[in-house]
């Protein structure tokens, strides 16, 4: 399994570098970033960390969960000043992705892995909060029950028509 060390971490993109290289969804990511409001108590908690905390993020610009969650991390890092974020493109860093497979088999992103200054891992966030996953699954079940023409419930969401996917994920 790949070990994360200071040298490997340093090869990742900064948040601004990641945004600059995006070829898709940059407007959506920046709109989400503009909407993010960090609670003052949360911001103070991050500012008071014995830092720095190094955050390795696995991301791709086509992923809706990345577009939703990465702006929160980017803004928090900028405002708190204690998070050192480096972003690695999942599809170009399969060795890192193998370390953080969701349920041991899925290449879910984003992944945010948190490390102390000795690069000992202290926590991992994968994809999205469980409550969001549950809510999305329920919405998809309802949608497929109401619209059998969209295929079976278990069909991948990317097979749905774009306007339908947008409706499902917006709710």
Task: Provide a role label for each language-model segment.
Residues 1-53, 74-84, 90, 97-108, ...:
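Non-globular targeting/processing and membrane-anchoring segments
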Residues 54-60:
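Short glycine-rich or small-residue beta-strand-to-loop segments that form or flank ligand, phosphate
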Residues 61, 91-93:
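Short, solvent-exposed coil/turn elements at secondary-structure transition points
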Residues 61-68:
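Conserved redox-active cysteine motifs that mediate thiol-disulfide chemistry
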